[in-house]
From Swiss-Prot:
<keyword id="KW-0489">Methyltransferase</keyword>
<dbReference type="GO" id="GO:0036211">
    <property type="term" value="P:protein modification process"/>
</dbReference>
<dbReference type="GO" id="GO:0032259">
    <property type="term" value="P:methylation"/>
</dbReference>
<keyword id="KW-0949">S-adenosyl-L-methionine</keyword>
<dbReference type="GO" id="GO:0030091">
    <property type="term" value="P:protein repair"/>
</dbReference>
<dbReference type="InterPro" id="IPR029063">
    <property type="entry name" value="SAM-dependent_MTases_sf"/>
</dbReference>
<dbReference type="InterPro" id="IPR000682">
    <property type="entry name" value="PCMT"/>
</dbReference>
<keyword id="KW-0808">Transferase</keyword>
<protein>
    <recommendedName>
        <fullName>Protein-L-isoaspartate O-methyltransferase</fullName>
        <ecNumber>2.1.1.77</ecNumber>
    </recommendedName>
</protein>
<dbReference type="Pfam" id="PF01135">
    <property type="entry name" value="PCMT"/>
</dbReference>
<dbReference type="GO" id="GO:0004719">
    <property type="term" value="F:protein-L-isoaspartate (D-aspartate) O-methyltransferase activity"/>
</dbReference>
<feature type="active site">
    <location>
        <position position="62"/>
    </location>
</feature>
<keyword id="KW-0963">Cytoplasm</keyword>
<dbReference type="GO" id="GO:0005737">
    <property type="term" value="C:cytoplasm"/>
</dbReference>
<comment type="function">
    <text>Catalyzes the methyl esterification of L-isoaspartyl residues in peptides and proteins that result from spontaneous decomposition of normal L-aspartyl and L-asparaginyl residues. It plays a role in the repair and/or degradation of damaged proteins.</text>
</comment>
<comment type="similarity">
    <text>Belongs to the methyltransferase superfamily. L-isoaspartyl/D-aspartyl protein methyltransferase family.</text>
</comment>
Length: 211
């Protein structure tokens, strides 16, 4: 990470703190992650702006505030094994991989998955397992998960993901179509409780796979 990038990432973390992010581990991960690595060169100059940016294939890299907020919500109970649905650029996975012992991440667009895998390898993040597949289905043979994060908006809460949560586990995801709400769902035995956190805007969670 260059000195300029490090300074920019540290300044971004300070802005996120001012915006309400309080988890110091999350802020530290943000400050140590070169966001420009996850963007095309043409957009690298915008890497440390607090905004979502396009990454191709109709997808985006999420606004840093949302990355930090969802991570903060996910870390509420110190999960050991985490599933991310929607690898995308790999930026959210890079943040999570610095904070949890084991991360599994699914991406339905093959090209994005390949790029993300290469980026995390360059960052020496080796506690991540990648899967090319349909995020609506989760990753059953790696379950149960202590926490699941979905980085695209589901029209309804995927039943497969609920079934793959460990007891006491949390699912953090945006739900809705035109109007979306960020939610945190907690599993207690066979019951689920939900919290609505805030209004958000994500690309839709689409089923199936795309080469």
């Amino acid at each position: 990470m260059t000195r300029v990038a490090l300074t920019s990432a540290v300044n971004l973390a300070k802005k996120l703190h001012d915006a309400g992010i309080r988890n110091q581990a999350v802020l530290k991960a943000i400050s140590h992650t070169p966001r420009e690595m996850f963007l095309d060169n043409a957009l690298a100059h915008k890497a440390y702006e607090n905004t979502a940016l396009p990454i191709g294939q109709g997808q985006t890299i999420s606004q840093p505030y949302i990355v930090a907020r969802m991570t903060e919500l996910l870390l509420h109970k110190m999960p050991q094994r985490v599933l991310e649905v929607g690898t995308g650029s790999g930026y959210q996975a890079a943040i999570l991989a610095q904070l949890v012992p084991q991360l599994c991440t699914i991406e339905r667009i093959k090209g994005l998955q390949i790029q993300a895998r290469q980026r995390l390898k360059r960052l020496d993040l080796h506690n991540v397992s990648f899967k090319y597949g349909d995020g609506w289905l989760g990753w059953a043979n790696r379950s149960p998960f202590d926490a699941i994060m979905v980085t695209a908006a589901a029209s309804t809460i995927p039943e497969a993901l609920l079934s793959q949560l460990a007891e006491g586990g949390v699912l953090v995801l945006p739900v809705g179509e035109d109007t979306q709400q960020l939610m945190r769902i907690t599993r207690t035995a066979d019951r689920f409780s939900s919290e609505t956190i805030e209004t958000v805007k994500f690309v839709p969670l689409i089923n199936g796979e795309l080469a």
